[in-house]
């Protein structure tokens, strides 16, 4: 028996709007959540048109061969950054006129594997045994509105399509919000102070992978309680009366506790690594995750919040280096504090879910609105934007205790008397000390 997708009726309305545009074809992404029992689709977003495609895609003037799968995968990468924990790209959709329907399934198969490959490229986490490996493809005929829903196993390149049910829900889907603020403190040694941005980005990723293991192994408290991973998130509901068994809190607070490595009796060997500079990511970031409220499990809540932590740090690092490669370093970058992208949340209309985006210091709310329209195909009002992280005022480190999200590049010689309070290179051994801050900062300390 194939998978069943329970779909928010807003997706049906969105498809109706696309049909009215009378294009020969439209590609896009499906957003939602997989679970062991049911799968949920909450949003659909069409792929932004390329500039040279505007005339080509008018009815009667295009063929499916003109679909650029790399362009669709780039859209998926950009959109993936805007999804909080628990939400993901479920698959792809293709809307065509009747004369183009014949080759739709071949195109969808190619797209779904390309999109998944792109989405997995820079993840700091790996799928586990409980993750669903099937991705959905949806073909809609713009004339008859007939829907063909199939799934592919993305772990098998030779996977054959399986039929699936696409069920619209007249009532809104119910979601549980997991709210979390996490302190991040990562120091990454760099072997050379003259690394290119690409080389530096690779080094940073290797360091983040090690940090990601700490997050994966961390202990999470839900509303101050430790819960068994395999248990229901709300065990007390089982003991309550039937009249109140339908109730569950809509927002719970998570606290993430990372512990220092345990010291045992086994012999350990110190790792000596030559280092010219180091990069430090520090501070507190705002995170959230969503799981469907139908008998939520602890393991699902853990997965949602931990993956959101990893995703938001990875996204900010990627965006920072993309901005540097595109615009070059700012003047005086070696000695000044620069804001990292600020996380901004936007509620989905008619739902308790929220999407997110990132705002650089020189960008405005209008830029965010334009980006949401381009990537998510959603119009956002300025008063709907939520800023849980304050902008960094670029103060000195000792004045930055309440400042989130900043980027600090600093050059200091180590032969000064007070340099040992930061970083010290002594006979090839690098000793780093933790610097308390509520900002997310990236600091380079160059060692001479």
Swiss-Prot record:
It comes from the Eukaryota. It holds the Pfam family ODR4-like. Keywords: Membrane, Transmembrane, Transmembrane helix. It is found in: Membrane. InterPro entries: ODR-4-like (IPR029454). It is a multi-pass membrane protein. Its main location: membrane. May play a role in the trafficking of a subset of G-protein coupled receptors. Belongs to the ODR-4 family. This is Protein odr-4 homolog. The gene is odr4.
């Amino acid at each position: 028996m194939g998978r069943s997708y329970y779909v928010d009726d807003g997706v049906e309305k969105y498809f109706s709007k696309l049909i009215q545009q009378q294009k020969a074809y439209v590609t896009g992404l499906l957003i939602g959540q997989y679970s062991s029992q049911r799968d949920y689709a909450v949003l659909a977003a069409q792929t932004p048109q390329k500039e040279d495609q505007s005339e080509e895609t008018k009815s009667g003037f295009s063929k499916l061969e003109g679909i650029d799968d790399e362009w669709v995968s780039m859209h998926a990468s950009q959109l993936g950054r805007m999804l909080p924990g628990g939400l993901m790209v479920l698959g792809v959709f293709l809307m065509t006129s009747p004369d183009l329907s014949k080759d739709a399934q071949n195109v969808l198969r190619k797209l779904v594997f390309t999109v998944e490959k792109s989405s997995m490229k820079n993840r700091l986490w790996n799928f586990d045994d409980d993750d669903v490996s099937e991705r959905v493809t949806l073909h809609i005929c713009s004339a008859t509105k007939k829907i063909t829903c199939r799934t592919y196993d993305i772990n098998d390149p030779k996977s054959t399509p399986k039929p699936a049910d696409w069920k619209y829900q007249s009532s809104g889907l119910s979601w549980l919000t997991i709210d979390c603020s996490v302190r991040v403190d990562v120091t990454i040694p760099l072997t050379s102070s003259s690394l290119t941005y690409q080389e530096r980005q690779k080094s940073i990723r290797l360091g983040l992978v090690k940090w990601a293991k700490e997050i994966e192994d961390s202990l999470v408290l839900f509303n101050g309680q430790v819960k068994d991973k395999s248990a229901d998130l709300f065990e007390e509901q089982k003991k309550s009366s039937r009249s109140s068994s339908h109730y569950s809190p809509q927002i719970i607070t998570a606290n993430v506790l990372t512990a220092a490595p345990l010291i045992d009796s086994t012999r350990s060997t110190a790792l000596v690594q030559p280092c010219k500079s180091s990069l430090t990511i520090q501070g507190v970031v705002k995170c959230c995750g969503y799981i469907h409220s139908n008998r939520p499990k602890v393991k699902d809540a853990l997965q949602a919040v931990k993956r959101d932590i990893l995703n938001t740090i990875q996204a900010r690092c990627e965006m920072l280096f993309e901005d540097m490669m595109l615009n070059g370093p700012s003047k005086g970058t070696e000695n000044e504090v620069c804001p990292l992208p600020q996380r901004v949340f936007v509620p989905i209309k008619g739902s308790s879910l929220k999407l997110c985006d990132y705002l650089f210091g020189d960008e405005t709310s209008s830029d965010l609105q334009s980006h949401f329209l381009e990537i998510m195909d959603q119009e956002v009002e300025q008063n709907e934007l939520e800023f849980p992280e304050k902008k960094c005022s670029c103060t000195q480190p000792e004045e930055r205790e309440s400042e989130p999200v900043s980027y600090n590049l600093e050059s200091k010689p180590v032969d000064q008397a007070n340099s040992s309070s930061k970083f010290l290179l002594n006979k090839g051994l690098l000793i780093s000390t933790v610097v308390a801050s509520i900002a997310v900062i990236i600091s380079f300390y160059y060692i001479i």
